[in-house]
Amino acid sequence: GFFALIPKIISSPLFKTLLSAVGSALSSSGDQE
């Protein structure tokens, strides 16, 4: 099923890039607040 794909998605470089981008956006928006 779908859940079997989750570890592959999480370990993918694209996901890590996206995650770090989201983290940067969240931390920067938190700094502005």
UniProtKB/Swiss-Prot annotation:
One of its GO terms (molecular function) is toxin activity. InterPro entries: Pardaxin. This is Pardaxin P-5. Exhibits unusual shark repellent and surfactant properties. Forms voltage-dependent, ion-permeable channels in membranes. At high concentration causes cell membrane lysis. Pfam families: Pardaxin. Coiled coil: none annotated. The keyword Membrane applies. Consists of a C-terminal hydrophilic region and a predominantly hydrophobic remainder. One of its GO terms (biological process) is monoatomic ion transport. Keywords: Ion transport, Membrane, Secreted, Target cell membrane, Target membrane, Toxin, Transmembrane, Transport. It comes from Pardachirus marmoratus (Finless sole). Belongs to the pardaxin family. It is found in: Secreted; Target cell membrane.
